[in-house]
Amino acid sequence: MSDEAKEKRELESQKESSHNKSEKSVEPKPKRRRRRNYDDYDAEVAKEETKAKNGLTKSENNGTVEDSESDMDDAKLDALMGNEGEEEEDDLAEIDTSNIITSGRRTRGKVIDYKKTAEELDKKEPSTGSKDDVGYGEKEEDDEDEEDDDFKE
């Protein structure tokens, strides 16, 4: 038996080595990863930075002029923001009050008289009782009274 086990181990090792050789000979080609070319973008950013630096040196000399321009820009933005708020308030005035649902149920535009529908349902199925009926509650109370009488002995 030990001879058979040794032979099996030898065969297994041979299979593994042949399998490894086949893997080595047929290596999958490594996937090429393409690097994005940011060189053009970097050049544009560098140009903008140099312009900004040049603009800063000029703006330091003309600081008062730039401050007044920024104040004007702020005023324009405030005016625009104020106009947007007024438009929203105007939209609220255009809402028709007849479209507002006063009851608690949504009916997707249909006007439903719930009292009439309840009466129609009662006419169609008068034998069906609901949990809200008085008779339903009385049956439960009677059962409880009977149980209590048994325990009072």
Curated annotation (Swiss-Prot):
What are the alphabetically sorted keywords of the record?
A: Acetylation, Chaperone, Nucleus, Phosphoprotein
- Looking at the Swiss-Prot or TrEMBL record, what is one Pfam family this protein matches? CHZ
Enumerate the residue ranges of region (Disordered).
1-153
Any single biological process term in GO: chromatin remodeling
GO molecular function (one)? histone binding
| Polar residues biased stretches | 56-65
Q: Where is the composition biased (Basic and acidic residues)?
A: 1-29, 110-138
Which of the residues bear the PTM Phosphoserine? 68, 70
The listed locations are: Nucleus
State whether keyword Phosphoprotein applies: yes
- At the top level of its lineage, which domain of life is listed? Eukaryota
Q: Where is the composition biased (Acidic residues)?
A: 84-94, 139-153
Residues bearing N-acetylserine are: 2
* Gene Ontology CC annotation, any one: nucleus
Q: Where is this region: Important for H2A.Z-H2B binding?
A: 87-108
What remark does the entry add? Present with 623 molecules/cell in log phase SD medium.
Q: Which family does it belong to?
A: Belongs to the CHZ1 family.
Outline what the protein does.
Forms a chaperone-bound H2A.Z-H2B complex that acts as a source for SWR1 complex-dependent H2A to H2A.Z histone replacement in chromatin.
Summarize the subunit comment. Forms a heterotrimer with H2A.Z-H2B, stabilizing the association of the histone dimer. Also, with a lower affinity, forms a heterotrimer with H2A-H2B.
Please identify the protein, giving its name as recorded.
Answer: Histone H2A.Z-specific chaperone CHZ1
* Species this protein is from: Saccharomyces cerevisiae (strain ATCC 204508 / S288c)
Q: What is the lineage of its organism?
A: Eukaryota, Fungi, Dikarya, Ascomycota, Saccharomycotina
